[in-house]
Amino acid sequence: MSGAFETELRVAIDAARRAGAIQRELFEHLEHVTPKGRRDVVTEADYRSEAAIIGAIRATFPGDAIVAEESGGHGVSVEEAIDGPRGSAAVARAWFIDPLDGTVNFANGIPIFCAAIGFALEGRPVVGVLYDPSRDELLHAVRGRGAARNGHPFHVAPPRGLDECLLGVVHHRGFLRTVARLRPRVRAVRDLGSAALAIGYVGGSRLDGYIQPGGLSPWDLCAAGLIAEEGGATVSAYDGGPWFRYPAGPAARAGRARQPAHRSAALSALVAAPGIHAQLLALLRG
């Protein structure tokens, strides 16, 4: 491990493994599961994992901004960390943490979840780590240096026909018609229950693509999007635009203003191998 952002990568890997140890300890041994909104839950594993990750980062980078799913912004808001305060430059150094992506799976004893830790420099993701403790599998990427699984480089699958593709999707109510329209055009669709893992899997060719029209937060995307991109996938927003930028315009800003300060889930994703990405984008626009 050498080169730019070596220390950030080392800290992220160490933090993710600490969180993973907590999750292994508590998996199928939870005493309480607390509802969080209509579709989500939060557990002791989320809180303890997040505290462990933040502690590991603070020990080495005490001045960095942190945005975490459960505790929110530490010294910065979500929008400031990505887009900067009122349109000025983004925060120079910011970490985006989802301590346990796939909490519903975790709470129900389904071993599909991960810790996701991303680091962005002036609003641009440059380090990403996903750790799946159930498989002891670590995906990581550094911008410009490719992506790896447990230290072994990986890349997107070779080009193939859309009808051979396995797509990751999210089965939210507003997206069901689109999923139904896509289903006959591909081999199969799957909702893994962890957006971060699904996006990372595109970079490693386990999935050929992932589509989510909204409902994503920066901590879902920072690490996973970079890993997919460094694995050779094309990563964009659902409409083909930049993937780590909040939608612009008064309506988009008003919608985010109605969200709690650290829960602006206004991002989207379309991730696939380059040739497949273009076909999927055309289908979604059609």
PLM regions with names:
Residues 1-100, 281-286:
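N-terminal subdomain of lithium-sensitive/metallo-dependent phosphomonoesterases centered on the IMPase/IPPase/PAP
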Residues 1-10, 14, 180-183, 200-286:
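Oxyanion/phosphate-interacting regions
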Residues 19, 23, 46, 57, ...:
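Residue-level signal for inorganic ion chemistry
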Residues 22, 63-65, 188, 208, ...:
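Residue-level detector of anion-binding/catalytic polar loops
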Residues 29-33, 185-192, 234-236, 286:
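Short secondary-structure junctions
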Residues 83-148:
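DPxDG-like acidic metal-binding loop motif
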Residues 146-149, 153-155, 174, 276-279:
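Short helix-loop capping/hinge motifs at secondary-structure junctions, enriched
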Residues 155-174, 183-193:
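Short loop->beta-strand "edge-of-pocket" segments that line small-molecule binding or catalytic clefts
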